[in-house]
UniProtKB/Swiss-Prot annotation:
Its main location: nucleus. It comes from Homo sapiens. One of its GO terms (molecular function) is cyclin-dependent protein serine/threonine kinase regulator activity. May be involved in the control of the cell cycle at the G1/S (start) and G2/M (mitosis) transitions. May primarily function in the control of the germline meiotic cell cycle and additionally in the control of mitotic cell cycle in some somatic cells. Belongs to the cyclin family. Cyclin AB subfamily. Interacts with the CDK2 and the CDC2 protein kinases to form a serine/threonine kinase holoenzyme complex. The cyclin subunit imparts substrate specificity to the complex. Does not bind CDK4 and CDK5 (in vitro). The cyclin A1-CDK2 complex interacts with transcription factor E2F-1 and RB proteins. Found in a complex with CDK2, CABLES1 and CCNE1. Interacts with INCA1. Interacts with KLHDC9. This is Cyclin-A1. GO terms for cellular component: cyclin A1-CDK1 complex; cyclin A1-CDK2 complex; cyclin A2-CDK2 complex; cytoplasm; cytosol; microtubule cytoskeleton; microtubule organizing center; nucleoplasm.
Length: 465
């Protein structure tokens, strides 16, 4: 190795120690397959990608093994892609602002609105036949509500037949295509005037306010059917609350790297918690579960989700494409393909539409709501609708010195006294976040598009009387 290069460890993706023995699992209706941890090849140091000045150093196995991410100050062009943070049992080390490191947006369009163009797929890694499975399952006695939620829903037959006015369709098509008599500019201006007429109707057409209460009641019923177990971590033999916090913080970075929607993050965390509620996972595979949950959520929510190779890359190829796809398959099996779940984000958006607030209050409510994702305890014991109400109250009090308006109390059925326990927990998380090592959410909301709401001083106390 050249002496001009410092030893640099590219980020790996293991949470915890090395060389764990994986538990096997066999369950009814689930595939009998295994996953294999990628071993460290040697203790020697390698030079990787000398043009970018990055050195890949491997370390010996051991309980005290740790990895550090830095960059050599050689002045060469930065690498074309950015590998996200390293997950370990002791903490997360990642590239930070202020070290002269530029985060590179790879391939995705603005707000994930355009399909990737000119992408080069990463080469598939060879997969060896793994010996044992990395999961163990425990089955709790299902309650009657759980049995009902897992039953197969029969499809509904559409008995109503709607007639199509073909004359109108033909006239519209003739209007758009008859360029001999109408110039393209006139067509564009006509379409523009039509869109202005539609927009003049306001947001009631889109928000279907006449059905808002029915939609809300349906979501309130659905959130009970799809909530994870509040204290599932007590049954996990090899992972802890801290490891889950590190994983969720990393998922926030993944969402920012690929400019995914906020709802995608909430769905991924819901899938993760529901999976861990009935499956025990070893720490070496926890990030694989989280990555598969994010992949599945992005497929469900995004117009142009990142490709599988992108998710393999962000784990620094710790897991192969085949492993990730198999984990996605297992995740769908465990979730019974039930992916349409109400989240805190959905309820919060309903509250914000129902009760108009300023943009700063809206962004602050979204910020404190995302903070609830970091901690399974205590927030999993609260329903998403209640967490959203607490986030609204906390943001409204911070900016406007008011808590819970009467309009939302009537709409949601929640009184302020019912919100107070969750509000107190959320306020505590709001006060503690500047001192925590997991800063991805706080860094996200430091951006100007969110009006830098994470830099606002939280209220020291909540005057609830």
């Amino acid at each position: 190795m050249e002496t001009g290069f410092p030893a640099i460890m590219y980020p790996g993706s293991f949470i915890g120690g090395w060389g764990e023995e994986y538990l096997s699992w066999e369950g009814p209706g689930l595939p009998d397959f295994v996953f294999q941890q990628q071993p460290v090849e040697s203790e020697a140091m390698h030079c990787s990608n000398p043009k970018s000045g990055v050195v890949l150093a491997t370390v010996a196995r051991g309980p005290d093994a740790c990895q550090i991410l830095t960059r050599a100050p050689l002045g060469q062009d930065p690498p074309q892609r950015t590998v996200l943070g390293l997950l370990t049992a002791n903490g997360q080390y990642r590239r930070t602002c202020g070290q002269g490191i530029t985060r590179i947006r790879c391939y995705s369009g603005s707000e994930n609105a355009f399909p990737p163009a000119g992408k080069k797929a990463l080469p598939d890694c060879g997969v060896q036949e793994p010996p044992k499975q990395g999961f163990d399952i425990y089955m709790d006695e299902l309650e009657q509500g759980d049995r009902d939620s897992c039953s197969v829903r029969e499809g509904m037959a559409f008995e109503d037949v709607y007639e199509v006015d073909t004359g109108t369709l033909k006239s519209d098509l003739h209007f758009l295509l008859d360029f001999n008599t109408v110039s393209p500019m006139l067509v564009d201006s006509s379409l523009l005037s039509q869109s202005e007429d539609i927009s003049s109707l306001g947001t009631d057409v889109i928000n279907v306010t006449e059905y808002a209460e029915e939609i809300y009641q349906y979501l309130r019923e659905a959130e009970i059917r799809h909530r994870p177990k509040a204290h599932y971590m007590k049954k996990q033999p090899d992972i802890t609350e801290g490891m889950r916090t590190i994983l969720v913080d990393w998922l926030v970075e993944v969402g920012e790297e690929y400019k995914l929607r906020a709802e995608t993050l909430y769905l991924a965390v819901n899938f993760l918690d529901r999976f861990l509620s009935c499956m025990s996972v070893l720490r070496g595979k926890l990030q694989l579960v989280g990555t598969a949950a994010m992949l599945l959520a992005s497929k469900y929510e995004e117009i142009y989700p990142p490709e599988v190779d992108e998710f393999v890359y962000i784990t620094d190829d710790t897991y192969t494409k085949r492993q990730l796809l198999k984990m996605e398959h297992l995740l769908l099996k465990v979730l019974a393909f039930d992916l349409t779940v109400p989240t805190t984000n959905q309820f919060l958006l309903q509250y914000l539409r129902r009760q108009g607030v300023c943009v700063r209050t809206e962004n602050l409510a979204k910020y404190v709501a995302e903070l609830s994702l970091l901690e399974a305890d205590p927030f999993l014991k609260y329903l998403p609708s209640l967490i959203a109400a607490a986030a609204f109250c906390l943001a409204n009090y911070t900016v406007n010195k008011h808590f819970w308006p009467e309009t939302l109390a009537a709409f949601t059925g929640y009184s302020l006294s019912e919100i107070v326990p969750c509000l107190s927990e959320l306020h505590k998380a709001y006060l503690d976040i500047p001192h925590r090592p997991q800063q991805a959410i706080r860094e996200k909301y430091k951006a100007s598009k969110y009006l830098c709401v994470s830099l606002m001083e939280p209220p020291a106390v909540l005057l609830l009387q």
